[in-house]
Regions:
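Compositionally biased, intrinsically disordered low-complexity regions
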Residues: 7, 13, 208-210
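Conserved functional micro-motifs across diverse proteins
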Residues: 21-212
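Bacterial N-terminal signal peptides that target proteins for export
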Residues: 1-9
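Hydrophobic h-region of N-terminal signal peptides that target proteins for export
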Residues: 11-20
């Protein structure tokens, strides 16, 4: 079953009850997910249990159940700390050049395995236009073990994506945290004319991947 069915099922449950939009929480494979739907668009996220030296990441899934196309991009995501200051997500190109470009091969392998493990924890988390599709395309265009590994890691980064009605996508959104967890606060998503807000209490057990 596709990601859009997973996310839209939550939206359908809310509509069936006639209740206003509310955050639904669930746990899978050790990750704590939150999902929220607004006028057909559904956003889901979970903190990934790893840090790549100076960066923290969240796994994101977005499904468009509305009647209109919309474009979602990593710059739509921000984190509001308890003191009110904002931490804005990195653009996909910055993730590749600043983060993945300096990571060791071992770090890249760990990043890939961490993200793929998070996907395997939710059998229904299968995007129509997400990580797996980007990975396959990148692997087809690259040759050499090191280049193919880097391409796969780059495919993890959430990229600007136009979602037609019924389409979905996923990826990792990265925040510069200087080696510290995101901490307590709110994940804020401003996209497609909607604002999604999630109370965020990440686990403190995240593993740090070294950059060289």
């Amino acid at each position: 079953m596709h990601l859009r069915f997973t996310l839209m099922a939550a939206a359908a449950a809310i509509l069936a009850c006639g209740a206003p939009a509310q955050v639904i929480q669930f746990e899978s494979n050790g990750l704590k997910y939150q999902t929220l739907s607004k006028t057909g668009l559904t956003v889901m996220f979970a903190h990934l249990p790893m840090q790549l030296r100076d960066y923290s990441a969240v796994q994101v899934g977005v499904s468009n159940g509305s009647n209109a196309a919309c474009t979602v991009k990593p710059e739509d995501f921000s984190f509001r700390r308890e003191d009110g200051t904002m931490n804005y997500a990195l653009a996909a190109k910055d993730v590749v050049t600043q983060l993945l470009g300096r990571a060791s091969r071992n770090d890249v392998s760990k990043l890939i395995s961490t993200y793929e493990m998070s996907l395997s924890g939710i059998p229904r988390l299968h995007s129509t236009n997400g990580y797996e599709q980007r990975r396959q395309q990148a692997l087809a265009e690259m040759s050499g073990t090191k280049l193919r590994a880097a391409a796969a890691a780059s495919a993890i980064a959430f990229v600007s994506t136009k979602l037609e009605p019924g389409e979905s996508t996923d990826g990792a959104v990265f925040f510069l945290t200087y080696g510290k967890p995101l901490g307590n606060g709110q994940l804020v998503v401003r996209t497609c004319g909607r604002i999604f807000e999630f109370e965020s209490l990440p686990s403190s057990s995240g593993k740090t991947l070294e950059q060289r």
